[in-house]
């Protein structure tokens, strides 16, 4: 039996690669407009980082991580998300000593052993932004403006909903958790086994449960917005004011808690037809939690597979780049040498050029050139070499002509 790709993974084939390049280039460009620079972190980290950073009661840590022991006896985990590794890098490399805020973006593969769903595999890819060093609501609004601009203006996606909430600070949450536990007590026996554990350790996680019975129970649960303190309420009001002044529409959804324990104050999700396209929020205590200095922070993750799926479903075309500008057909060994030389010089001039490497007939070479979408086809044989000329056909209109084998003249025609 042939070895196949593992369940939940997918090959990115050459015919699809340009789509990934397109969205990555768009996201790199808008990141630069906001003064955000790239970071790259390792594929795997110490398991302890995610236990402490993401939260031991989360589904990610309890059920979904790919964890193994390496040959040195260390517990290692393939990263299930990008924020905790970015925080670790921020601390380990003393980036907190630089001028703040520190703004970074990344493209990274992530790994979660979870039930596969539309636009989400077990190995998936994220574009993420993390901003360290500012506790102002203005940075939250700035990042949300980037997200909505990218999705609506750069990619042209319609029908998106930006939903926001505030999870307050630890003091707010302590009061809310007590109220939530009081509400949940009468339905405790109907909770799933995981949520029964959460009831004592972290009742807010129950709001994020995907089990149908638990989702029904929390529908009428208390709203955390009724329990946030004056400072957190002021922060949320400022966020809304900043979004209003930029003309960014939003909905307030008190049931957004996100699936990771590190969030505080602002949390958000961008929804399209019931699917979360993008989500994130503020995590003012995470840097301290993993032994760094007290540092407020804000970030989000955007699933690239899901983004590509939406673009496809919306009929938004991604322009396919020209694969081959010039195909040089040759007849005989002498002509093959000239074709090799010409292709080399064309490529040096920035022109995409190909030649035959299979010993095909000229007819078969021209058929291949047409198949790969060559803009021009050249033909070289012994007579062309003797006359120092080359036959050129412009594929768009079929016009044929001859020019000298002078590289500068050929480049001017093609460009």
Curated annotation (Swiss-Prot):
Keywords: Aminoacyl-tRNA synthetase, ATP-binding, Cytoplasm, Ligase, Nucleotide-binding, Protein biosynthesis. GO terms for biological process: histidyl-tRNA aminoacylation. Its EC number is 6.1.1.21. It is found in: Cytoplasm. It comes from the Bacteria. Belongs to the class-II aminoacyl-tRNA synthetase family. Homodimer. This is Histidine--tRNA ligase.
């Amino acid at each position: 039996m042939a070895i196949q790709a593992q369940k939940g993974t997918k090959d990115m084939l050459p015919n699809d690669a340009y789509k990934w390049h397109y969205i990555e280039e768009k996201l790199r460009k808008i990141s630069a407009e906001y003064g955000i620079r790239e970071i790259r972190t390792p594929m795997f980290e110490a398991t302890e980082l995610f236990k402490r950073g993401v939260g031991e009661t989360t589904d990610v840590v309890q059920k979904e991580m790919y964890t193994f022991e390496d040959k040195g006896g260390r517990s290692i985990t393939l990263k299930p998300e990008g924020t905790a590794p970015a925080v670790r890098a921020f601390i380990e490399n003393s980036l907190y000593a630089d001028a703040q805020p520190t703004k970074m973006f990344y493209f990274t593969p992530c790994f979660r052993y979870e039930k596969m769903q539309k636009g989400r595999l077990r190995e998936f890819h994220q574009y993420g932004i993390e901003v360290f060093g500012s506790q102002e609501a203005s940075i939250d609004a700035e990042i949300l403006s980037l997200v909505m601009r990218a999705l609506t203006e750069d990619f042209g996606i319609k029908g998106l909903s930006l939903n926001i909430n505030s999870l307050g600070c630890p003091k707010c949450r302590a009061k809310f958790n007590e109220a939530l536990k009081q509400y949940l007590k009468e339905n405790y026996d109907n909770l799933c086994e995981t949520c029964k554990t959460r009831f004592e350790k972290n009742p807010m996680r129950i709001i994020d449960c995907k089990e149908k019975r638990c989702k029904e129970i929390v529908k009428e649960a208390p709203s955390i917005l009724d329990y946030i303190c004056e400072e957190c309420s002021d922060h949320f009001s400022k966020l809304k004011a900043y979004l209003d002044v930029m003309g960014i529409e939003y909905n307030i959804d008190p049931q957004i808690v996100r699936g990771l324990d590190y969030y505080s104050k602002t949390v958000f999700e961008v929804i399209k037809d019931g699917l979360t396209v993008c989500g994130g929020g503020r995590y003012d205590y995470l840097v301290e939690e993993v032994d760094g200095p007290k540092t407020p922070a804000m970030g989000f993750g955007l699933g690239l597979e899901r983004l590509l799926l939406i673009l496809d479903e919306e009929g938004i075309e991604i322009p396919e780049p020209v694969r081959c500008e010039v195909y040089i057909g040759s007849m005989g060994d002498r002509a093959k040498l000239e074709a090799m030389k010409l292709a080399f010089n064309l490529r040096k001039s920035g022109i995409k050029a190909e030649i035959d490497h299979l010993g095909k007939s000229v007819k078969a070479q021209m058929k291949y050139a047409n198949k790969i979408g060559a803009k021009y086809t050249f033909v070289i044989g012994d007579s062309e070499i003797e006359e120092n000329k080359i036959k050129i056909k412009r594929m768009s209109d079929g016009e044929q002509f001859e020019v000298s084998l002078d590289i500068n003249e050929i480049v001017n025609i093609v460009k």
